[in-house]
Amino acid sequence: MVKYCIYTENVNRDLIESILNENLESFSIQDQIGVWKGTKEKSLKIEVLGTYQDDHIKYVAGLIKVLNNQQAVLVTCERLENNWLI
């Protein structure tokens, strides 16, 4: 299993959620404060657990980047060794 995190500015949240619902089976969203080039901004951390292909997550992040007219959206990927769904 893989944990992906997408970090983006907290604007167009309803449209971001629509993109996520259309492209992912499940996800969670956390409100955060981020800093980009010295400027503090409200941001979102989108966490996705699953067996998605990396390119699919990059595609989703790209849709969010275009929607929010951002220079960059950070995506992290962590391979999980042990996990349980109880």
Would you name each region that the model predicts?
Residues M1-I86:
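Positively charged, small/polar-rich N-terminal and surface patches that mediate targeting and assembly
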